[in-house]
A protein has these predicted regions:
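Short, conserved acidic/polar surface loops in the N-terminal third of protein domains
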Residues: 13-19, 36, 58-61, 119-121
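Conserved structural elements of the adenylate-forming
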Residues: 16-40
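Active-site glycine/GP-rich loop and adjacent strand/helix microenvironment
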Residues: 44-46, 59, 68-173
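Residue-level signal for inorganic ion chemistry
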Residues: 5, 62, 108
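Conserved adenylation A10 loop of the ANL superfamily
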Residues: 2-17
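Conserved AMP-binding loop of ANL adenylate-forming enzymes
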Residues: 34-71
């Protein structure tokens, strides 16, 4: 596999490359710390990925990371809520509604820009959710292609107000 950087540092003209002849070591180096630091209290959790998955972007280590998280730690109802058109808002809303009605903790995973698009959509439709205790947000950073100027603190405040997930359950990778 060849993982490539986005190239934004050089205006998209140069993309760094990271070669992996075998992904077995890469996968283990992802799974073991993920379980230890993100999932120490449970084997599985329902996961909603709000960024591209591995099948959409095979040159992205982040896309592989998110896909592996669902494979190794996702429970029934987990999935990727992003396609070639962007966020699948109707499916995300259904996921969040189910999480609230089931009262089970869930985890959202994605880049910061996806969280902003989700927040904007939820605000526009006057939607808030009270996700179960121990729900968590996994933010991988990256405000690329966002039109809204916001700090990480402001985003975390909005996420807590909109989804009911306290800051201490938000991880930034």
């Amino acid at each position: 596999a060849v993982f490539m950087t986005s190239g934004t540092t050089h205006g998209g003209k140069m993309r760094g490359r990271n070669f992996h002849p075998d992904l077995e070591v890469w996968d283990e180096s992802m799974i073991v710390p993920f379980r230890h630091f993100i999932m120490p209290d449970r084997e599985r959790i329902r996961i909603a990925v709000i960024s591209p998955a591995w099948d959409m972007n095979q040159n992205s280590s982040l896309s592989r990371y998110l896909t592996k998280a669902v494979e190794c730690c996702g429970s029934e109802g987990s999935g990727v809520f992003f396609d070639e058109h962007g966020l699948k808002f109707d499916e995300i809303i259904a996921f969040l509604n189910r999480a609230v009605s089931d009262g089970e903790p869930v985890m959202l995973m994605g880049v910061s820009s996806s969280y902003l698009y989700l927040l904007d959509y939820l605000h526009e439709h006057d939607l808030t959710f009270a996700l179960a205790p121990d729900s968590r947000l996994f933010d991988t950073g990256g405000f690329k292609s966002t039109k809204r100027d916001i700090t990480e603190d402001q985003m975390l405040d909005e996420l807590e107000q909109t989804l009911g997930v306290p800051r201490h359950h938000c991880v930034n990778m």
